[in-house]
Amino acid sequence: MGEIIKYKGFDHVWQYSGPWLYCLIGIYISLPVLAYHILPWIFHKNRSNKRKTISIFVLGDLGHSPRMCYHASSFSKLDYYVNLCGYVETEPSHQIVDDVNIDIIPIEAIKNTNNLPYIMFAILKVVRQCGKIWSILWDTRGSDYIMIQNPPSIPILLIVILFKTVFSRETKLIIDWHNLNYTILNLRYNNLNHPFVKLVKLYEKILGQFANLNITVTKSMKKYLVKEFGFQKSKIVTLYDRPGVQFQPLSNKREFMSEHKLFEDIDIEKYKVLISSTSFTPDEDFNILLDALKNYENTPNTPPILLIVTGKGPLKGKFLETVDKLEFTNKVCVKSAWLSSEDYPKVLACADLGISLHTSSSGIDLPMKIVDFFGCGVPVVSLDFPAIDELVKNKVNGLITNSKSDQTKEVARLVTEVFTDDALLRSIKEGALEESNSRWDENWMQTFSSIFENKS
């Protein structure tokens, strides 16, 4: 019978050990301390005895991201140092550029100049953005807060969570929910069960819960995040969009119109001015408005209309082609304009009526353009969708179409009704002027000053 195997313990292991074994044991024991204490201490910028800092990220053009710029300005007024990071395709307002507390950090806008397939370009764009965003996070490390907007949240939400977890654990994450990323992606696929759409929804649902604070633009969105995404209600605050100080009723309206090139070939005493602003994206169907104006053109006893459409985007060329094909008479004049941040609010204030064709990919966001119109005291006609009544009160500050009716006929009917009924126009104009009294600064301070008050 063979010799019985005897337990000898681990003493024999030390016969083959050396400094390398002690080194490995030391590294293993020190890893948690290194990851959770030493690295953050080394890489965290020393901001002791300094005022608080927030880094605001916008994966879009800063000049056309008013809500995020308003946030930056509001934090500045609380004496925060603000890193405002985003695309600089158009210059932000002077209020932002001239603010000594706000540092604008450009992010390169990556465009598909080589006409790559959508998936290939999307992957390339995400990879390049990851590098740039990480670089900015590194340079601005140690911020008290990081704020991002959603959408878009790919790839920035994941990058920020990883960065703050490893290198900036005291930094708090704020997500400003303008809409839902997956519903916008669904405009491309028109299938909520598409794998990409479901993946993006899961991305938002899981990673969004890492935020210390979620801000929503509507109460409907807050309810959605609680019910569908399982967010904690206590971590969600609704902050309605309100106009900035630059959006005001224009006292010298006729003088401005007589000097601006948009109105130079128009008899401003005869024409009613209709204005809509857009990004020319698929979630706004301008054929509804153009076909409605064709119907209006054939309606007797109605005043002539000047339609001004401001903005730019992928479908602008198609819009202009449609205008040419419709061959409007002098009764309907259509102009497209890309306005500076200084001219835009003044031109809006010249309108007799605003038009919003926004229908919302999610049904729970609201168009900023209507807020801008109200700031200038201009009533609106809006298409109907679930959350619109949180902003537009029918026959009080505007008119809302009947969603069960043909939308082209509805828009034509409402525009005709407003421009042939002076009493109705005066009434909704008064309602819009009443809305203009509610401003961003007061609303933001009332909601957030106690949360973000700089006590350092």
Swiss-Prot record:
GO terms for cellular component: cytoplasmic side of endoplasmic reticulum membrane; endoplasmic reticulum. Residues 104-124 dip into the membrane without crossing it. Residues 44-103, 125-456 are cytoplasmic. Pathway: Protein modification; protein glycosylation. One of its GO terms (biological process) is dolichol-linked oligosaccharide biosynthetic process. Pfam families: Glycos_transf_1. The keyword Glycosyltransferase applies. The chain crosses the membrane at residues 23-43. It is an enzyme of class 2 (transferase). Residues 1-22 are lumenal. It catalyses: an N,N'-diacetylchitobiosyl-diphospho-di-trans,poly-cis-dolichol + GDP-alpha-D-mannose = a beta-D-Man-(1->4)-beta-D-GlcNAc-(1->4)-alpha-D-GlcNAc-diphospho-di-trans,poly-cis-dolichol + GDP + H(+). GO terms for molecular function: chitobiosyldiphosphodolichol beta-mannosyltransferase activity; mannosyltransferase activity. Coiled coil: none annotated. It is found in: Endoplasmic reticulum membrane. Its EC number is 2.4.1.142. Gene3D superfamilies: Glycogen Phosphorylase B. It is a single-pass membrane protein. Participates in the formation of the lipid-linked precursor oligosaccharide for N-glycosylation. Involved in assembling the dolichol-pyrophosphate-GlcNAc(2)-Man(5) intermediate on the cytoplasmic surface of the ER. Belongs to the glycosyltransferase group 1 family. This is Chitobiosyldiphosphodolichol beta-mannosyltransferase. The gene is ALG1.
